[in-house]
């Protein structure tokens, strides 16, 4: 900026000199009566010589201009963190490698000349080598090259910018690959004063024709509109930073690169109308009761039910008096399993600009009533048939008299009386353009408005109302779709209950908003029913919990061929047990990919993915490590910190897990104090304190040790109850014995281990003896063993730790 005035003045001076010179020349031509055509010849010659001279001196400027002209016809580039690029001085640019044109994105974002590092096998091709040499390309091989490393160091020392992609290869799965240590070797001979490392992250090219995503995913991502590309540059790092430190920063920068896309997202209701209009004749849902439902029918009914919901609210004259930390819109209760009815009601509630609250029908009457009171729910959409099924299972729900139950069966009868209106609506949906439908039915574009309230599992205490806005949910859907490489021919099994974030976001909203067919099945514990639904409909993506997947693996009626169509199986909501992973893979020949998250993160934060083998370079693109919960999703950052002072810990050091991302919740309903405890803003990112203990390895894979609340302090040592359960599982038959470890206070040792065991009377004593006589560490051996009828579980299949501890206390008296 200081030199800008001098540059402009100098430019104006030379322009004036040139104009004066040509004016004098034109005067001479007139005086001596020379044909004016020769003047134009002379001007053309001067222009040609000048252009050739500039091309020789500044070839990169011409290329940058040409790139911009060509690139901006198809793409729109947004640069975040440009202020972190030094105006002068040496720097090493390090970032992710997602496509063949990443170098072009970097060069267009930075006006300075950049020396790019290129794989020697590409550089050596004779027909491009001569051009690459002109632009100072630095060739390097995968085995390393002393000359190339010295050249990189030389350019940095001379004050130039050098760009290197430390993965050394294009990503095959959209995630970061292993960072090679070549740049560390290049910087060894440099001092910290010679330059800095500038990390960067590119978003928007995964799924393009220039990436190595699969054909089906690329086909889904083709668009006639300009593709939005974002590149985010981070703050300067020391030149001698290690590869795992740089990779961690690149991961965090993905948050900034995703920022513009997430901020520009529609509401869920508007996104639904767009998707439905694009796929009117396609099947949206196949329901076990309702049959095949097309997008045309689904959109028509969702718009019609929206009127019904608004009318009911008006009739009931509902005007909730909200607290200071609660949304102003009315909350509508939904008490339905995974089904067409549930999906339709959720969409209609959002179109009506209300808040959807999917109630946990397995939580017990006390917890259910507390949730209804906290959210100030006056009306609940449910089904008589479903309530009868719950009653047959011993779940009797008694609602207060001020709660209005609206049964889906009655809605169906009401709709039958209005067939003409519904038919008219269907015609309108078919004819009217998407933008007009949105302006009529969903005029609000505020993606920060609260969309849903989900009550947390309550596995360790009272359920908390988690407020998620439209941006939270749409961001997480986009992230998940990217890493799963969703295809047009994918079919997703929707069997997880919608009161769980995993079921609502991943198996309910994702297929509907991504234009993917879903198969609804209301009971995930019905192994044979699930398997039949998968086999009959060629399901390709199945999500479940360790508990549910274990049920399928142990069921003798299920055959491997029933799950043959599955291309990916994802486990979440609870830790995937080793025996479940092994048994499932042996029986069905399908790997389970474990993920991680929380209701507070909408829910997915990280997930394992299939590994890819690169035959060009004989490399494994590793996206799956057994025992881990995968790498953070694109746009998500994970930090491991000291729980006492929030200082960052190094790779492989256990600490408190923080999750940052656009999917981090707004807060807890009517509980700002608790929200402020678990959500902290650091470096411009909102971080959620998970309460989990774990670590990141050098490649960025996340490993969970246990929850901090699931540690017992015995004789001064912190012992993980989860680790105890893993050790015990090695010595007993987990197919016939279920167990859970908890801890109780002890006057001498601080705490003592209690083991609750679910098994037959005949084998209880044998199980206890097997554990007592095993070679597990003495500190891991329980003090008390209690036989119980059934391990308490939540609706998601997770162990109800709160009830387990209460049960242990009562038994120990």
Predicted regions and their residues:
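A cross-family acyltransferase "interaction/gating" segment
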Residues: 81, 157-161, 174-242
């Amino acid at each position: 900026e200081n030199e800008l005035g001098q540059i402009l003045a100098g430019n104006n001076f030379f322009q004036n000199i040139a104009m004066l010179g040509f004016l004098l020349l034109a005067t001479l031509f007139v005086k001596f009566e020379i044909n004016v055509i020769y003047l134009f010849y002379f001007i053309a010659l001067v222009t040609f010589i000048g252009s050739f001279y500039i091309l020789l001196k500044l070839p990169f400027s011409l290329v940058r201009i040409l790139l911009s002209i060509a690139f901006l016809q198809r793409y729109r580039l947004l640069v975040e963190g440009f202020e972190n690029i030094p105006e002068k001085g040496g720097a090493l640019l390090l970032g992710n490698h997602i496509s063949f044109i990443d170098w072009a994105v970097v060069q267009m974002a930075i006006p300075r000349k950049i020396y790019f590092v290129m794989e020697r096998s590409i550089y050596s091709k004779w027909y491009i080598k001569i051009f690459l040499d002109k632009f100072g390309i630095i060739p390097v091989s995968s085995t390393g090259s002393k000359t190339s490393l010295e050249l990189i160091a030389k350019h940095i020392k001379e004050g130039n910018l050098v760009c290197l992609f430390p993965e050394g290869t294009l990503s095959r799965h959209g995630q970061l690959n292993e960072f090679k240590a070549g740049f560390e070797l290049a910087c060894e001979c440099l001092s910290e004063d010679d330059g800095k490392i500038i990390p960067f992250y590119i978003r928007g090219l995964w799924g393009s024709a220039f990436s190595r995503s699969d054909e089906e995913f690329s086909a889904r991502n083709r668009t006639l509109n300009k593709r939005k590309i974002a590149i985010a540059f981070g703050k300067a790092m020391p030149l001698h930073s290690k590869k795992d430190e740089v990779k961690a920063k690149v991961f965090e920068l993905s948050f900034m690169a995703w920022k513009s896309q997430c901020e520009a997202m529609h509401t869920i209701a508007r996104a639904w109308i767009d998707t439905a209009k694009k796929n009117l004749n396609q099947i949206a849902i196949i329901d076990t009761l309702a049959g095949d439902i097309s997008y045309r029918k689904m959109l028509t009914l969702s718009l019609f039910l929206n009127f019904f919901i608004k009318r009911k609210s008006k009739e009931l004259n509902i005007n909730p008096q909200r607290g200071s930390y609660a949304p102003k819109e009315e909350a509508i209760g939904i008490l339905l399993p995974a089904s067409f009815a549930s999906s339709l009601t959720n969409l209609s509630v959002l179109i009506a600009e209300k808040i959807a609250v999917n109630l946990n029908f397995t939580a017990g009457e006390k917890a259910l009533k507390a949730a209804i009171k906290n959210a100030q729910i006056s009306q609940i959409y449910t089904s008589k048939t479903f309530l009868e099924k719950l009653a047959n299972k011993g779940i009797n729900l008694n609602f207060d008299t001020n709660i209005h139950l609206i049964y889906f069966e009655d809605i169906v009868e009401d709709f039958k009386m209005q067939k003409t209106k519904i038919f008219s609506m269907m015609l309108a949906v078919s004819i009217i353009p998407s933008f007009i439908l949105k302006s009529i039915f969903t005029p609000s574009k505020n993606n920060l408005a609260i969309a849903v309230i989900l009550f947390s599992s309550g596995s360790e205490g009272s359920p908390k109302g988690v407020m998620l806005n439209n941006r939270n949910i749409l961001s997480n859907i986009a992230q998940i779709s990217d890493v799963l490489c969703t295809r047009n021919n994918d079919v997703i099994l929707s069997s997880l209950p919608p009161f769980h974030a995993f079921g609502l976001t991943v198996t309910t909203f994702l297929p509907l908003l991504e234009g993917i067919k879903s198969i609804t099945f209301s009971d995930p514990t019905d192994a044979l029913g699930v398997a039949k639904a998968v086999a009959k409909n060629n399901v390709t993506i199945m999500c479940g919990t360790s508990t549910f997947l274990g049920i399928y693996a142990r069921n003798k009626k299920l055959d491997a061929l029933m799950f043959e169509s599955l291309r990916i199986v994802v486990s979440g909501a609870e830790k995937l047990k080793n025996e479940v992973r092994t048994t499932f893979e042996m029986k069905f020949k399908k790997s389970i990919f474990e993920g991680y998250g929380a209701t507070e993160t909408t829910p997915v934060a990280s997930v394992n993915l299939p590994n890819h083998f690169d035959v060009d370079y004989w490399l494994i693109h590793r996206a799956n490590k057994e025992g881990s919960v995968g790498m953070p999703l694109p746009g998500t950052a994970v930090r491991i910190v000291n729980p006492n002072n929030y200082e960052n810990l190094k790779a492989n050091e256990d600490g408190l897990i923080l999750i940052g991302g656009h999917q981090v919740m707004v807060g807890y309903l009517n509980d700002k104090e608790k929200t402020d405890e678990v959500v902290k803003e650091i470096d411009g990112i909102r971080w959620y304190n998970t309460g989990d203990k774990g670590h990141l390895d050098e490649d960025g894979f996340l490993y969970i040790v246990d929850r901090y609340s699931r540690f017992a302090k015995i004789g001064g040592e912190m012992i993980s109850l989860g680790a105890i359960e893993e050790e015990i599982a090695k010595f007993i038959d987990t197919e016939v014995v279920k167990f859970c470890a908890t801890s109780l206070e002890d006057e001498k040792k601080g705490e003592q281990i209690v083991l609750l065991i679910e098994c037959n009377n005949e084998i209880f004593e044998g199980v206890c003896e097997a554990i007592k006589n095993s070679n597990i560490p003495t500190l891991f051996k329980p003090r008390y063993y209690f036989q119980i009828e059934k391990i308490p579980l939540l609706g998601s299949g997770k162990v109800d730790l709160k009830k387990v501890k209460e049960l242990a206390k009562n038994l120990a008296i």
